[in-house]
């Protein structure tokens, strides 16, 4: 048997991962992941959960087969047997964070009965996302609920970032991605649904954070933008902003403030990243068209060849509940086509 600690060079980390403690890196955002290969007949992981809700789980993908593992909903290190009786050969492995602010977790070690090897995956394209629950992959696994409201009291059981359009698109394009998305996120603080109802927190607070959950044991920590420079940034904000005042966006004075903050963040990212391409979107989740109209105004006001505004075929009209994996894939396919025809040509 061999135990490989988290600081082993064979592990590669993707996403805004806290690497300050090399032997216990913290996976924070939905979709953050660890990749490697291993030779062996079983896989056991040691993780330290940091729960912030009633249910938390993670997943491991071994040679394309996904294993969901429910975590002990308490602080502290625990061992998780992922798979046994595997063929004694080299396996590809991805360990990833399924959910957003339900928890963070520290990766401690991997145990198997063979060798640990680095992943062979290479990326020619880098993506980054800023979005809400749809982008984070919430309730994607509630199959047969397409075009319907979410199951009652689902409690995060159906959340899976692997089936979000964000990760689906990255796989289709063979791209690396950082997904900085959170359910309920809006643009402004004191709007949306994240950390409500008394401490509503928006993208204006989270976009430049590593640890972005105000009530987490880690608090808020700053992100070092030099760690990752994307080629394409997908900005998916505007579907939670109607709370608590759905009519505010119709007021021209408020709309001007909203657009100015949106542009302020976008232009800061544009400067930090040396002018990547931006795609401004909402999603197929039902919402008022006024938000897409305001985003189109932003695109026109910026008047930049680096900034695109994309509307899905069923934009704002496909489902009253979170998009399921089929609906997420619909979005990923459309974005793939748009990117290949307009940016990667």
What is each of the regions a protein language model found here?
Residues 1-161, 345:
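N-terminal secretory targeting modules
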Residues 14, 214-225, 263-268, 293-298:
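Alpha-helical scaffolding within the catalytic cores
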Residues 126-130, 135, 177-180, 231-236, ...:
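Structural recognition of the beta-strand scaffold that forms the well-ordered cores
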Residues 151-251, 286-289, 326:
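Conserved SGNH/GDSL esterase-like catalytic core that processes O-acyl groups on lipids
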Residues 162-176, 265-277, 299-305:
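A structural motif corresponding to the C-terminal end of an alpha-helix
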Residues 167, 171, 260-267, 293, ...:
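Solvent-exposed, polar/charged alpha-helical surfaces in well-ordered, non-transmembrane soluble domains
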Residues 234-243, 262-297:
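Active-site segments of SGNH/GDSL-like serine hydrolases
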Residues 277-345:
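Extracellular serine-dependent O-acyl
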């Amino acid at each position: 048997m061999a135990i490989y600690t988290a600081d082993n060079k064979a592990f590669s980390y993707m996403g805004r991962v806290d690497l300050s403690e090399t032997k216990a890196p913290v996976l924070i955002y939905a979709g953050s992941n660890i990749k490697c290969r291993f030779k062996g007949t079983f896989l056991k992981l040691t993780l330290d959960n940091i729960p912030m809700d009633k249910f938390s789980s993670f997943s491991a993908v071994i040679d394309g087969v996904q294993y969901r593992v429910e975590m002990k909903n308490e602080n502290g290190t625990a061992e998780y047997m992922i798979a046994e009786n595997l063929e004694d050969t080299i396996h590809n492995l991805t360990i990833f964070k399924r959910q957003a602010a339900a928890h963070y977790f520290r990766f401690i070690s991997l145990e198997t009965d063979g060798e640990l090897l680095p992943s062979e995956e290479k990326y020619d394209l880098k993506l980054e996302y800023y979005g809400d629950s749809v982008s984070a992959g919430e309730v994607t696994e509630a199959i047969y609920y397409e075009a319907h409201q979410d199951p009652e009291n689902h409690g995060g059981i159906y959340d899976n970032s692997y089936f979000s359009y964000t990760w689906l698109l990255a796989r289709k394009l063979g791209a690396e991605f950082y997904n900085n998305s959170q359910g309920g996120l809006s643009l402004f603080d004191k709007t949306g649904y994240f950390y409500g109802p008394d401490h509503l927190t928006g993208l204006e607070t989270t976009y430049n954070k590593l640890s972005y959950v105000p009530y987490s044991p880690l608090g808020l920590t700053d992100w070092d933008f030099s760690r990752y420079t994307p080629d394409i940034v997908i900005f998916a904000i505007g579907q939670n902003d109607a709370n608590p005042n759905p009519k505010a966006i119709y007021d021209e004075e408020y709309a001007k403030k909203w657009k100015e903050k949106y542009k302020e963040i976008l232009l800061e990212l544009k400067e930090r990243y040396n002018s990547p391409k931006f795609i401004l979107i909402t999603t197929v989740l039902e919402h008022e068209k006024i938000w897409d109209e305001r985003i189109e105004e932003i695109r026109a006001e910026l008047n930049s060849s680096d900034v695109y505004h994309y509307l899905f075929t069923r934009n704002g009209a496909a489902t009253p509940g979170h998009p399921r994996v089929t609906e997420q894939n619909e979005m990923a396919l459309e974005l793939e086509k748009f990117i290949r025809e307009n940016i990667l040509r």
